[in-house]
């Protein structure tokens, strides 16, 4: 039986769905920033990157809120262990990706990137997309199927 009968899982259509929308939106905004830098549109690059960073921070805050409000702990069952380890490991990668993108924003504001020279940002954007895709699998397997 998954989750165990003693566990009350989160409603997948509340904070988990909001977090899914936030990460998908951040994937759109980082893509917007990437297209902007390729077109030498510095103001849109700044806007897209700033929005992505804010969305990453917002996701992290909501995830922390969810942890504090969880009706179960990491020690309650295999479900609690799986939930906190999988979402925590993902959350750590979101924080790392947000820091990567923040460094890219600082570098962009210091004119370290151009339309032909922006691999650091491109690598961070690919990393961010990977984190997005991983979240979709976590959302389906932990929140949706686990409900």
Curated annotation (Swiss-Prot):
Catalytic activity as recorded in UniProt: 4 Fe(II)-[cytochrome c] + O2 + 8 H(+)(in) = 4 Fe(III)-[cytochrome c] + 2 H2O + 4 H(+)(out)
Translocase among keywords: yes
Keywords: Membrane, Mitochondrion, Mitochondrion inner membrane, Translocase, Transmembrane, Transmembrane helix
InterPro entries attached to this UniProt entry: Cyt_c/ubiquinol_Oxase_su3, Cyt_c_oxase_su3_dom, Cyt_c_oxidase-like_su3, Cyt_c_oxidase_su3-like_sf, Cyt_c_oxidase_su3_a-hlx
EC number from the UniProt entry: 7.1.1.9
Membrane topology: Multi-pass membrane protein
Protein family membership: Belongs to the cytochrome c oxidase subunit 3 family.
Name of protein: Cytochrome c oxidase subunit 3
Organism for this UniProt entry: Spodoptera frugiperda (Fall armyworm)
């Amino acid at each position: 039986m998954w989750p165990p009968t003693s566990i009350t899982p989160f409603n997948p259509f509340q904070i988990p769905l909001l977090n899914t929308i936030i990460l998908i939106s951040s994937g759109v905004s980082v893509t917007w920033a990437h297209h902007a830098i390729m077109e030498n549109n510095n103001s849109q690059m700044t806007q897209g990157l700033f929005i992505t960073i804010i969305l990453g921070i917002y996701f992290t805050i909501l995830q922390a809120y969810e942890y504090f409000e969880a009706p179960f702990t990491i020690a309650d069952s295999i479900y609690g262990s799986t939930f906190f380890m999988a979402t925590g490991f993902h959350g750590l990668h979101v924080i790392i990706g947000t820091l990567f993108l923040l460094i890219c924003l600082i570098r962009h504001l210091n004119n370290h990137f151009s339309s032909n020279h922006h691999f650091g940002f491109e690598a961070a954007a690919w990393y961010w997309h990977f984190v997005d895709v991983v979240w979709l699998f976590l959302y389906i397997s932990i929140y949706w199927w686990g409900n």
